[in-house]
Each structure stands twice: as structure tokens, then as C-alpha cells.
Amino acid sequence: MAIVELNRLTKRYGKRRGIEELTFSIEEGEIFGFIGPNGAGKSTTIRLLLNLIHPTAGSAKVFGKDIVRDSRDIRRDTGYLPSEVHYYDDMKVADLLRYSAGFHGKLDENRMRRLAERLALDLSRKIADLSFGNRKK
């Protein structure tokens, strides 16, 4: 089963092209990455898939759900971390996770601890003290 399907997905910004008739699919279990130079459409494609911006033409599905009609379900089941993320440097890892969980009303301290252990994150460390890679985790 394809977990991501794009069919002639297009995004234009006025007369400027974002992406043009992009068609591909990603099957369950495949490893896929967006690579390319600046302006190639990587971020545009990801933002379209999460319905953070709207397509000009074409269609796409994530987990079999339409990116426009079912965008709430898709965003509930996925995560998105843009490359340019800024945090409060004095905030601790645990504080950030609690803050983020609050958006969904799903604070689970045990799950938070298990996740931190799995990712080798110290919940008591300040964000400013983390390496770039650990901030991205």
C-alpha cells in the first residue's frame, strides 16, 4: 500500500512556480528523503502534504487520506519539524515536551520518559545546552 501518493501535484505562487505536476508514491516500508538544491520544492511539497499551504492543482494522499479534505487526520498522525526551529534557550527538554503535548491535550509523563530514554535525551537539560542534533530530536 502506498503511504504517500502525489498525482500531478502543483503549487504556483502567482506567476512563479513552486512545484509542477509532481507525481510519485512511497510504499509502506520504503525509506524516502527529499534532497535537492534551494528552491527545488522540497519544503513546498512537505507543506502541501500537511495542508499548511494549498495546492494549485493536482492531488495527494497520505495514509490513503486526501491532503485537503482529511488534513486534520493527517496532521494528527504525522509530525513536521521545519529546518529552522527556534526554542526558548532557558526551557528544559521536559518543559518543551509538556508544552508540545499541551497542543493536543495528551500529556503522558510515562510516555514522555520512555521517548526521552529511547532518544537518549536528558529531560532536565536546557535546550541551549543541547547539540544541534539533539535539538532536532
Model-predicted segments: where are they?
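ABC transporter nucleotide-binding domains
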Residues: 2-137
